[in-house]
């Protein structure tokens, strides 16, 4: 029998991330969504670092300010008459809050594989409930379900386990800055494949 000790913050963070991420991309393109997501994650992790009395370095602040200016410029001027980008922005900020919480929680993980597995197991009912409450009118095929399981449940879980393995060795501000590579990768891959 495998004993699974779940962590409430890990489950909460992963649930917010998955639900916000899923619904946010109905309104946003991949590159813009990832910029909002990881810019927001940076704010959450910087705030956590400051609140825990670990002051960011000058280099950290420069990176943070540059990222925030980039996000503001990306969305300026913002069309307040269109609800679609605002919905996407709000949902992606919810995902950012969730991933920030999940990442901060990972800095304390003693067993990354077990932590990730228990977080996924306890997140599944929350995510399924959100799909029932907010159906998104998609058609499911067996092949599509298979691909979702392979990419989402298996590959993401392995990636999240790796992230939880690395996190204890990084300062929160460095972990936040490292994640700013994701939007660049997402933009490049979306230009190639989408």
Can you describe what each PLM-predicted range is?
Residues 2-33, 37, 73, 152-170:
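Specific transmembrane alpha-helical segments of multi-pass solute transporters/efflux pumps
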Residues 2-4, 61, 76-98, 132-150:
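Juxtamembrane helix-entry segments on the extracytoplasmic side of multipass membrane proteins
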Residues 3-12, 55-68, 88-89, 110-121:
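Cytoplasmic-side transmembrane-helix entry/capping segments in multi-pass membrane proteins
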Residues 11, 15, 19, 39-46, ...:
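Hydrophobic/small/kink-forming positions within alpha-helical transmembrane segments
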Residues 33-40, 106-123, 156-192:
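Helix-helix packing/entry segments at the starts of transmembrane helices
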Residues 40-65, 184-194:
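C-terminal transmembrane-helix exit sites in multi-pass transporters
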Residues 44-46, 50, 81-134:
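Transmembrane alpha-helical segments that form core, pore/gating elements
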Residues 56-77, 125-128, 180, 189:
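Hydrophobic transmembrane alpha-helices of multi-pass small-molecule transport proteins
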